[in-house]
C-alpha cells in the first residue's frame, strides 16, 4: 500500500527492519497476552506482533489505514477500533492489558496523561516517542529535562529508556531523534498521595514558573511553617524536588 503520511495525524512510519526487531524483542509478547497497539500505521510492528500473539487489538483514527488493515489481516487475529486514542477507554478491552505504539509526536503528552487514567487496567506500556519527550519522562530531579511530566508519570510508573532511534528509521523522516521507552505501573505506589487531584494541582503550580522558588510558586498553598514541618527548603525550585517530595507536600495539605 502506498499511503501518504498525514501531517494532521502526526504520521511517521517506522521502516527499519533491524530496529523493529529490537523493539519487538524488548516488548517480548507472549501468545496469551492481551495487547493493544496505538496507531499501527502500515503494520511495521503489527505484523511481527501478530506472529507472536494469538490476537491483537489496535486503535487507529485514519480511515484509509483502517480500510487497508481490514483487507490485509484476518479478523480472527486482529480487532480494529476506529477511534481517537485520546478518547478511547482502554479498560473496555481488558483488566490485564499491554499497550504498545509508535505514538503521534504532536499529541504524545496528552495520550500519556490519558493512559495514566487507565493505569489500573495496564500491565506495561512500550512506546516510540520523540527523544526529547522520553528524556523528560525518565528525567531525574535537578536535571534540565525534569518537569511536570517527569513527576506525574514517575509517581505511577517505573520508567526505562530502552533505545535511541535515528530519523532515517522512519518514512517520512522526522526532524528529530526518537526513543523507545518502557513504562510499568507500580502494583503498590512507593509514595501514595491521599488526594491525587491535589497532587496534580501542586505539581502544575510548582512548574508553571520553573525559575521561581517554591515559596513563590506555592504561595497561598504552603507557608514557611509548612515548609519547615516538611523539611523542605522554600528557596528550592520545583526541579529540585523528587516525586516523593511533591507527595509529601500534597499529603500535608490534605491532612
Curated annotation (Swiss-Prot):
Q: What class of enzyme is it?
A: transferase
| UniProt keywords, alphabetically | Cytoplasm, Methyltransferase, RNA-binding, rRNA processing, S-adenosyl-L-methionine, Transferase
Q: Which residues bind S-adenosyl-L-methionine?
A: 12, 14, 39, 60, 84, 102
Pfam families, per database record:
RrnaAD
The record lists the catalysed reaction(s) as: adenosine(1518)/adenosine(1519) in 16S rRNA + 4 S-adenosyl-L-methionine = N(6)-dimethyladenosine(1518)/N(6)-dimethyladenosine(1519) in 16S rRNA + 4 S-adenosyl-L-homocysteine + 4 H(+)
One GO molecular function term? Answer: RNA binding
Compartment(s) where it occurs, according to its Swiss-Prot or TrEMBL record: Cytoplasm
Instruction: Show the InterPro entries listed in the entry.
Output: KsgA/Erm, rRNA_Ade_diMease-like_C, rRNA_Ade_Mease_Trfase_CS, rRNA_Ade_methylase_Trfase_N, rRNA_adenine_dimethylase, SAM-dependent_MTases_sf
Cellular component annotations (GO), alphabetically ordered: cytosol
* EC assignment: 2.1.1.182
Organism domain of life: Bacteria
PANTHER family recorded: DIMETHYLADENOSINE TRANSFERASE, DIMETHYLADENOSINE TRANSFERASE-RELATED
- Function, please? Specifically dimethylates two adjacent adenosines (A1518 and A1519) in the loop of a conserved hairpin near the 3'-end of 16S rRNA in the 30S particle. May play a critical role in biogenesis of 30S subunits.
Q: Which family does it belong to?
A: Belongs to the class I-like SAM-binding methyltransferase superfamily. rRNA adenine N(6)-methyltransferase family. RsmA subfamily.
What is the name of the protein in this document?
Answer: Ribosomal RNA small subunit methyltransferase A
